[in-house]
């Protein structure tokens, strides 16, 4: 009898692991990859990235893919286990399979073309949802030939790609589709309420009835979930269900203002400061926002009405993609962390260059940010800004794969890197 119970327990454990693995790979809200029973691919021999880039002690970095035909931006792993990446400027999606499991992509396969500035990607129910400059589409392989030729429009209720043209999407834990759209300007009062905002749709592109402005007289306002977010290139949900977004602040106030807002606790129906206000201070912050004096506040509106950030970085750091470290190959001490890809500065003075890097933001026991430290550095040429031609690379996105390794896209060096822990 006891042998029968052992068999039942083993089967149940195996079923649980397989079930969690499939859920992680198929997409959804915030994807948290749980530990797998399969062995991770081996670490390839040291290459240019391994020799040039500095990674935190106990980790190694290698090139996963290089010589991409255009600038790689945001990434997502598909239900097939392969990495997909948007090539924004060429209007393409590339697939990077590692069929021989050696830790490097075997080839670069263009699986979709003729898209309009594709950026954010997320898989759901066998479809790849793509955030384009002025629309959301979903793609799949309808005939089994490996290309994503079947295409459906979800919504074109997205502002035109003027100014900040990247669009990012994620499905939330509520099953709704969230889309970030940046501003059309450095600082201004936007005519279109969908700009400098996070929008919220049903999966079919319709407006949820519980959106804060679902019945507004201006139909453009109906998809708005939160606003005052000048350029939130990425966002995610914490295990506790809180929505966090990053935010690229305005230029023109010197090297030190305004700080980049890295962790903004986004609240539905709320204003988050831009263009009138910003969160002061660097690091952990707790005070109200302060005014950008270049633009007058509307009558009756004050900066203490804005939702402030909880954690900031030096001005002009340019935070782009971000991800949480739970359920990865990383040692336990590195899992309770937020990882952020910084594009780095292009317009600061020589003594105040902001580095292009991947940074680790440490979270406390209740999941709140408390400190930051470099995780991957060495992309920038000494003394040169990240926008300089001598720059080796500029991180754009950071995600974890189904085997628990970290992947970093580099839209300057046209590479994807893979980071794993080492003994």
Predicted feature locations:
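Acidic, glycine-anchored loop motifs typical of Ca2+
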Residues: 101-107, 142-147
């Amino acid at each position: 009898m006891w042998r029968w119970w052992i068999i039942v327990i083993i089967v149940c454990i195996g079923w649980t692991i397989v079930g969690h693995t499939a859920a992680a790979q198929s997409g959804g809200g915030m994807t948290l990859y749980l530990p797998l029973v399969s062995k991770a691919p081996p670490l390839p021999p040291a290459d240019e990235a391994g020799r040039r880039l500095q990674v935190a002690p106990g980790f190694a970095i290698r090139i996963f893919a290089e010589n991409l035909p255009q600038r790689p931006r945001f990434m997502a792993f598909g239900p097939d286990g392969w990495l997909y990446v948007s090539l924004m400027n060429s209007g393409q999606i590339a697939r990077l399979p590692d069929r021989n499991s050696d830790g490097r992509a075997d080839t670069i396969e263009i699986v979709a073309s003729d898209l309009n500035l594709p950026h954010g990607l997320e898989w759901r129910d066998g479809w790849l949802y793509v955030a384009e400059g002025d629309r959301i589409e979903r793609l799949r392989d309808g005939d089994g030939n490996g290309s994503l030729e079947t295409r459906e429009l979800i919504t074109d209720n997205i502002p035109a790609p003027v100014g900040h043209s990247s669009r990012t999407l994620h499905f939330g834990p509520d099953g709704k589709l969230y889309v970030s759209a940046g501003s059309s300007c450095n600082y201004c009062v936007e005519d279109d309420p969908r700009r400098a905002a996070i929008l919220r749709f049903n999966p079919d592109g319709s407006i949820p009835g519980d959106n804060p402005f679902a019945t507004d007289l201006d139909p453009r306002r109906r998809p708005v979930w939160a606003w005052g977010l000048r350029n939130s290139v990425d966002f995610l949900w914490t295990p506790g269900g809180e929505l966090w977004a990053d935010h690229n602040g305005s230029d023109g106030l010197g090297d030190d203002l305004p700080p980049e807002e890295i962790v903004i606790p986004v609240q539905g129906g709320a204003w988050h400061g831009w263009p009138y206000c910003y969160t002061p201070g660097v690091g952990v912050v707790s005070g109200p926002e302060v005014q950008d004096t270049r633009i007058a506040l509307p009558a009756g509106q004050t900066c203490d009405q804005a939702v402030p950030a909880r954690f900031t970085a030096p001005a002009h750091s340019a935070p782009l993609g971000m991800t949480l470290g739970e359920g990865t190959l990383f040692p336990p001490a590195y899992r309770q962390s937020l990882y952020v890809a910084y594009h780095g500065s292009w317009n600061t003075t020589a003594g105040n260059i902001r580095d292009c890097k991947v940074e680790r933001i440490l979270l406390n026991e209740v999941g709140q940010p408390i400190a930051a430290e470099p995780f991957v550095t060495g992309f920038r040429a000494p003394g040169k800004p990240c926008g300089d031609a001598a720059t080796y690379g500029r991180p754009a996105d950071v995600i974890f794969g189904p085997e628990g390794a970290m992947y970093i896209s580099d839209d300057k060096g046209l590479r994807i890197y893979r980071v794993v822990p080492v003994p």
